[in-house]
């Protein structure tokens, strides 16, 4: 079972109460690398992602450069919530094909759960350089370690994220690094429903790219 198929089954560990949240709107880039191992298959998954997060209007967008072993592809993933109903759009940019899926879960706010254990603050690189705060987050299916830059008592910016766990006899670990994070949205058209998805059809995804196992990553 591919790692990308496994992760869509994982339960989110994000709680309703939070220690801190990202700004309501931001953009940035994420670089991820992960490994998975099951009875029949093991592999390495790598992604480079341009992301946009809009917590004000309950929507996200991600342009994913994806590699799983020798297989590589490019996807656009848009999540939108309107009138309390969520929809996931995944476009295979090489094939020009769209998959859609209705979402029963609520919009996932990019927040550190209130029950996360604060590990402490430390510096990346030189002492007195870039200061971050680390959190240990324990869930039923996955665990995570997240480091953030604190902006104020309520807001933080993601720096690194590592998630790991086991499901259906498949072990996995994934790390995420955040770069070039800026507040605000420069071009809101990134959240538009992709033109490839204008037909109201729903398909079973051959390659699930759910992001719900993350804490702050998109």
Predicted stretch roles:
Residues 17-18, 25-28, 59, 94, ...:
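Secreted/processed peptides and extracellular or luminal domains of membrane proteins
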Residues 105-134:
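Acidic, glycine-rich loop-and-strand cores that form catalytic or ligand-binding grooves
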Residues 47-115, 164-172:
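An acidic-aromatic
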Residues 19-22, 97-101, 110-112, 155-159, ...:
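Sequence contexts marking disulfide-bonded cysteines in secreted/extracellular proteins
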């Amino acid at each position: 079972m591919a790692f990308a198929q496994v992760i869509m089954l994982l339960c989110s560990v994000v709680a309703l109460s939070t220690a801190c949240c990202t700004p309501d709107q931001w953009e940035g880039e994420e670089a991820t690398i992960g490994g998975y191992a099951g009875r029949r298959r093991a592999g390495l998954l790598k992604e480079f992602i341009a992301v946009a997060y809009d917590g004000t209007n309950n929507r996200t967008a991600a342009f994913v450069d994806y590699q799983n072993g020798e297989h590589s592809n490019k996807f656009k993933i848009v999540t939108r919530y309107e009138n309390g109903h969520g929809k996931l759009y995944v476009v295979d940019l090489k094939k020009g094909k769209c998959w859609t899926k209705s979402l029963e879960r609520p919009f996932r706010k990019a927040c550190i759960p209130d029950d996360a254990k604060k590990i402490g603050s430390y510096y990346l690189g030189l002492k007195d350089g870039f200061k971050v705060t680390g959190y240990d987050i324990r869930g039923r299916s996955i665990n995570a370690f997240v480091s953030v830059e604190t902006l104020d008592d309520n807001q933080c910016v993601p720096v690194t994220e590592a998630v790991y766990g086991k499901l259906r006899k498949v072990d996995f670990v994934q790390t995420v690094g955040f770069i070039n994070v800026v507040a605000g949205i420069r071009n809101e058209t990134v959240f538009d429903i992709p033109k490839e998805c204008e037909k109201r059809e729903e398909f079973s995804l051959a390659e699930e790219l759910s992001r719900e196992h993350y804490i702050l990553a998109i």
